[in-house]
């Protein structure tokens, strides 16, 4: 089971999240049949949203949209405060690597665009904020969003590593944030450690990468573990939800669907689950 660990420095001036999202991203790859670059881009977006959702309370839902003008198209993710996340990428078939190193490329195929966050508190007035994409690598764009939009200086590292068959090997990341009251001396120490930190891909390949991430973040600084929360890819779609969506089309459209198509098939964008509606099902909706 994937997990996210919340920590705070003993001084109370910094907080850090470290997470293992391997099964989450593996499930996303299996459901959407993504190729290498698309897998990494979608995975990074899911991890970013898991971090954002961990910052929320109550029954909030957080939608992250990474909207670029490159080959990927849009990447959409929705997370809740219970550790569930779902998502999809418009173009699952991007598969580009550097010839010399085999490194999976993401940024060049994201293009220019926006990192958008929509927080739905369940009150009918969702809060939307956005920042420009600065690199298209998603991790850097997420850190920029946190610093600019949420006004919280943040360091972020997140990645997805693939095996020789381009299947998800490991996925995860971290977020470090400066809290009010941090001294200049403390900030300088943490900045130095983050700058000297091994590459996120190196840390993810450690036997226990959550511990490796926390050790790299805090060094010799004492810290407290606040909580450990389970994470998973989970879609909340249902037949009832799609029935309600069909009802919004109106009776004339449903009748045409019944007469001309002899039924309907709806595929959930987030998890690829198919819902079949027969002529009898449509007739029932028409008479509802």
Swiss-Prot record:
Under oxidizing conditions two disulfide bonds are formed involving the reactive cysteines. Under reducing conditions zinc is bound to the reactive cysteines and the protein is inactive. Disulfide bonds join 235-237, 268-271. It is found in: Cytoplasm. GO terms for biological process: protein refolding. Pfam families: HSP33. InterPro entries: Heat_shock_Hsp33, Heat_shock_Hsp33_C, Heat_shock_Hsp33_N. Belongs to the HSP33 family. PANTHER family: 33 KDA CHAPERONIN. This is 33 kDa chaperonin.
């Amino acid at each position: 089971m994937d997990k996210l660990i919340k920590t705070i420095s003993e001084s109370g001036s910094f907080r850090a999240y470290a997470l293992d999202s391997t099964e989450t991203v593996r499930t996303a790859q299996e459901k959407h049949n993504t190729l290498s670059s698309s897998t990494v881009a979608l995975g990074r977006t899911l991890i970013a949203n898991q971090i954002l959702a961990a910052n929320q309370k109550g029954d909030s839902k957080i939608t992250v949209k990474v909207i670029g003008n490159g080959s990927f198209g849009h990447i959409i993710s929705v997370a809740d405060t219970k550790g569930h996340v779902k998502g999809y990428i418009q173009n699952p078939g991007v598969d580009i690597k550097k010839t010399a190193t085999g490194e999976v490329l993401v940024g060049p195929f994201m293009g220019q665009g926006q990192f958008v966050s929509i927080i739905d508190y369940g009150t009918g007035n969702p809060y939307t904020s956005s920042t420009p994409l600065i690199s298209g690598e998603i991790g850097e764009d997420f850190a920029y969003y946190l610093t600019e939009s949420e006004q919280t200086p943040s360091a972020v590292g997140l990645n997805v590593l693939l095996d020789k068959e381009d299947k998800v090997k490991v996925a995860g990341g971290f977020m470090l944030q400066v809290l009010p009251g941090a001294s200049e001396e403390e900030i300088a120490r943490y900045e130095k450690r983050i700058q000297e930190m091994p590459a996120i891909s190196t840390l993810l390949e450690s036997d226990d990468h959550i511990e490796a991430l926390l050790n790299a973040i805090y060094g010799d600084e004492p810290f407290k573990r606040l909580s450990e929360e389970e994470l998973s890819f989970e879609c909340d779609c249902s037949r009832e939800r799609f029935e309600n969506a069909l009802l919004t089309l109106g009776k004339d459209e449903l009748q045409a669907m019944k007469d001309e198509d002899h039924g309907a098939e709806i595929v959930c964008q987030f998890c690829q689950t198919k819902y079949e509606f027969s002529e009898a099902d449509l007739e029932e909706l028409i008479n509802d």
